[in-house]
Amino acid sequence: MKAETPSFEAHQFVRVRRGDAVRRLIQRDKTPLAVLFMAAVVGTLAGLVGVAFEKSVNWVQNQRIGALAQVADHWYLVWPLAFILSALLAMVGYFLVRRFAPEAGGSGIPEIEGALEELRPVRWWRVLPVKFVGGMGTLGAGMVLGREGPMVQLGGNIGRMVLDVFRMRSPEARHTLLATGAASGLSAAFNAPLAGILFIIEEMRPQFRYNLISIKAVFTGVIMSSIVFRIFNGEAAIIEVGKLSNAPVNTLWLYLVLGMLFGCFGPLFNFLVLRTQDLFQRIHGGNIKKWVLIGGLIGGLCGLLGLMQPSAVGGGFNLIPIAAAGNFSVGLLLFIFIARVVTTLICFSSGAPGGIFAPMLALGTLLGTAFGMAAIPLFPAYHLDAGTFAIAGMGALLAASVRAPLTGIVLVLEMTDNYQLILPMIITCLGATLLAQFLGGKPLYSTILQRTLAKQEAEQAAKAQQAPRENT
């Protein structure tokens, strides 16, 4: 029996349904051009602010060092001047934060994570100037802080500023541009576009709403910020360590051991950061005068330490290539490592506007290089290069402390231009992350955010209890 042929109307119905399905698919994948345009604006502004922030900090540092050089031959002048200049610069940063924008203190990354969850406010009109000028003061004073945290917060606030200027009310656009600004800020700080993207996806994965619109916007913003950075600073790697040798397969187990070493140190480092924060809170008790004076004392001591041991202060970018080249002995590397652990804890935990990314990269380099130099005489047949362990160590502490191994791997490879070391980097960061997790360590930024939210809830509860008393 002959099968019945479908009618013309049936063919038309099927064709229409297919067309509707295709249109729905296209519509679902269609990113509003307005969002991409604003993402490009956010990325461009974040790149410009990043370049301006870097050059401003360098200018302040050069002015301070230049003033000290003028009296370098007179010890009775150079020591007091080193303390006074750094103390005054640091006090500017502490005062601005405490007086005008408390949320601008510290790294700023937990604030962006909280804002992505609508748990923390984004008051860009006061955070932008306070974080910029305050960061110039604390970083210019030579304190052990990095510019990446401020740049992430500045970028996120730029995203919210652009949103308000264009009067976008969509919750999705608000979230997307905030994430775009944060990624663009990190990219502009390190000249690491892929790391900026991965940082949002990996470190802020609980808060970031991953979809076709948001990821395209993040890509667009990061591209623009990277282009702006390279226009002003060139395309060379931000940390010049040269091309290092490959890691032979029979030496890879050493990188796992190194990763386990960082896996033990990472949770301890996080614990010390939190305890030091509590210590400073007990000392100043929220009093602005005590807080600023303590900040000035810390800044002044960093200025003095810079005269005695310059490698113990500053963000650490200048120290990394020197240490990775094997110019220090194992004993000196460990001494500088311990000194920088102490100064990093004091400077970051005091609430100064500045990040901890760069100091952690320097700490990882020091310990990684020391491990490599100690292993060379123990395994002469391996023909080891201490520099490869320095590169692996850079990302390992970041992986163990922040719990973002993929970001740590890509960030270090982009900054040093040593992509051939990706395998030992993966092994080291994986070992560090797994052991840190096994030991019960918590991600640093998430823990700081939880403490901030708990403090916020306590303050709100106190105000709620105080209101009825005032009315009676």
UniProtKB/Swiss-Prot annotation:
Binding site for chloride: S107, I356, F357, Y445
Segments carrying motif Selectivity filter part_3: 355-359
Intramembrane segments: 109-116, 177-189, 193-201, 387-401, 402-404, 405-416, 417-421
Pfam families: Voltage_CLC
Chief location bin: membrane
Subunit structure: Homodimer.
UniProt function note: Proton-coupled chloride transporter. Functions as antiport system and exchanges two chloride ions for 1 proton. Probably acts as an electrical shunt for an outwardly-directed proton pump that is linked to amino acid decarboxylation, as part of the extreme acid resistance (XAR) response.
Protein name, entry field: H(+)/Cl(-) exchange transporter ClcA
Species this chain originates from: Klebsiella pneumoniae subsp. pneumoniae (strain ATCC 700721 / MGH 78578)
